[in-house]
From Swiss-Prot:
Alphabetical list of InterPro entries matching this protein: CHDC (IPR031332), ChdC/CLD (IPR010644), Dimeric_a/b-barrel (IPR011008)
Signal peptide positions (record): none
Listed cofactors: Fe-coproporphyrin III
EC number(s) reported in the record: 1.3.98.5
Pathway annotation: Porphyrin-containing compound metabolism; protoheme biosynthesis
Reaction catalysed by this enzyme: Fe-coproporphyrin III + 2 H2O2 + 2 H(+) = heme b + 2 CO2 + 4 H2O; Fe-coproporphyrin III + H2O2 + H(+) = harderoheme III + CO2 + 2 H2O; harderoheme III + H2O2 + H(+) = heme b + CO2 + 2 H2O
GO BP annotations, alphabetical order: heme B biosynthetic process
GO molecular function: heme binding; metal ion binding; oxidoreductase activity, acting on the CH-CH group of donors, oxygen as acceptor; peroxidase activity
Entry's family note: Belongs to the ChdC family. Type 1 subfamily.
Protein role: Involved in coproporphyrin-dependent heme b biosynthesis. Catalyzes the decarboxylation of Fe-coproporphyrin III (coproheme) to heme b (protoheme IX), the last step of the pathway. The reaction occurs in a stepwise manner with a three-propionate intermediate.
GN (gene name): chdC
Record-given protein name: Coproheme decarboxylase
Domain of life: Bacteria
């Protein structure tokens, strides 16, 4: 059997995409609508407290286009906690005016393709811990997409020897590193958790950097020959201060 890549796993992750029922929202009185907004802000305040304690992170973005209106990205130490947050949101009055559009369940992941030789416990390495248990940046823009490694004929990633996969991922990773300071990337593994194998979440203050990064990577063999990609979701940061105006109708 071919050698499988080993992974380091961090916080569990939920991407929850919702479409807003604007027609129903318009039927509410100003007072009712404000109560719903306040309830959602209370939920966000609880998430802020959790983030301040270093026990998780979150980000809220509006989505451009017809695939969804809002994306909630939640990181927590356990799958149970993700379920609790999802359930609490679904029980809120605000959720009555949303329709689930898409979701993605995964876990923050680092592979051993780029790892050096060391007997030290990687989970005690501050640099590794910062990547496995990240505080999500509140960048102006987000881009999310799921992906697989191709398994077709001669283009079967999983039949390549470990050394060849490691070398390919090294050159692939160098492209991503060249965007350091421009794009923050969170890779989450989802084999056995969702329909795709990985989720990729990109954060940037300049939305054009998403296009530049993804386009450049398409010419790298890892993407050009072995990459399969799902739908792309692009959006803009929604802060607590911006929520009242966003939901004003």
């Amino acid at each position: 059997m071919n050698e499988a890549a080993k992974t380091l796993d961090g916080w569990y992750c939920l991407h929850d995409f919702r479409t807003i029922n604007w027609a129903e929202l318009k039927t509410l009185s100003t007072e009712e609508r404000q109560q719903i907004i306040n309830e959602f802000l209370d939920l966000m305040e609880k998430w802020n407290d959790t983030e301040a304690q270093g026990e998780g992170s979150h980000a809220v973005y509006t989505i451009v286009g017809q695939k969804a209106d809002v994306m909630l990205m939640i990181l927590r130490p356990s799958m149970e906690e993700l379920n609790e947050i999802e359930t609490a949101f679904n029980k809120s009055r605000f959720a009555e005016f949303t329709v689930p559009a898409y979701s993605y369940v995964s876990v923050v992941e680092l592979s051993n393709y780029m790892a050096g030789d060391s007997d030290d416990d990687p989970y005690q390495n501050p640099h590794v811990r910062a990547r496995l248990y990240p505080q999500l940046p509140k960048a102006k823009h987000v881009c999310f997409y799921p992906m697989d490694k191709r398994r077709q004929g001669d283009d079967n990633w999983y039949m390549l020897p470990m050394d060849q996969r490691r070398e390919l991922m090294k050159s692939h990773g160098m492209i991503g590193r060249s965007y350091a300071g421009k794009v923050k990337q969170i890779i989450t593994g989802s084999v056995g958790f969702d329909d795709w194998e990985w989720g990729v979440t990109l954060f940037a203050d300049d939305v054009l950097q998403f296009k530049k990064l993804v386009y450049e990577m398409r010419f790298d063999e890892v993407s050009a020959r072995y990459g399969e990609f799902g739908s792309f979701f692009v959006g803009n940061l929604l802060t607590a201060e911006g929520i009242p105006s966003y939901f004003y109708v």
